[in-house]
A protein has these predicted regions:
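Conserved alpha/beta core of the MobA/IspD/sugar-nucleotide pyrophosphorylase nucleotidyltransferase superfamily
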Residues: 1-42
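Nucleotidyltransferase catalytic core that binds NTPs
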Residues: 36-188
Length: 188
């Protein structure tokens, strides 16, 4: 499965996940044991959070990759949480939640009220949290450190995907900032 993470052009389905499924099936009892192990792997809860209101293919790629890891819970930052560190969202939180609910592979959508993941981790106890690797430094680093500490208390894992630096995503962001800055779009 590591090759799937390196290249989106492959689709290899693993029969063993970190030795959690390895075993011989010689009789019905073995099959029952292996089936139970498979269900445990599939039942893992995976959490990923978004503040975006402009969904692009990079976001969909993260969702697709995260969904491979288990039941995908998508957190949508509240309007207030988003506005606390960047502009007020163009699309209200309830609409953004509806948008994510309609995406294949999303198991549940919840609202995240703060930049901290603490309340989410305590409430949902995810086995895996997925995030872009862009929070290793800067203002998000303390939140990352908190996530690592909270997950380590019960054996949860943080999976960080490389943050996309594709120019087309930067263009979408720049275009939306430009449109928002035009006098016709400003209100007093």
């Amino acid at each position: 499965n590591a090759l799937n993470e390196v290249s989106d052009n492959t689709h290899i389905i693993p029969y063993d996940v970190k030795d959690e499924l390895c075993g011989e099936v010689d009789n019905p009892e073995d099959l029952a044991v292996m089936s139970e192990r498979l269900e445990q792997v599939k039942a893992k809860k995976v959490y990923v959070c978004f503040s975006t209101d402009i969904l692009h293919s990079g976001h969909l790629n993260i969702l697709r990759r995260a969904a491979r890891l288990g039941h995908l819970i998508v957190g949508v930052m509240s309007d207030e949480a988003v506005a606390s560190y960047k502009r007020f969202p163009l699309v209200p939180c309830e609409e953004r939640k509806a948008m994510f609910k309609s995406i294949k592979g999303v198991w549940q959508v919840v609202e995240q009220d703060t930049l901290s993941y603490k309340d989410i981790i305590e409430k949902y106890h995810p086995d895996v949290i997925v995030h872009g690797d862009n929070w290793k430094e800067g203002f998000q680093k303390p939140f990352r450190d908190e996530v690592i500490e909270l997950l380590s208390a019960y054996g949860g894992k943080l999976v960080e995907f490389p943050y996309s630096s594709d120019p087309k995503y930067k263009e979408v962001d720049a275009r939306s900032r430009l449109e928002l800055s035009l006098p016709d779009n400003r209100t007093t």
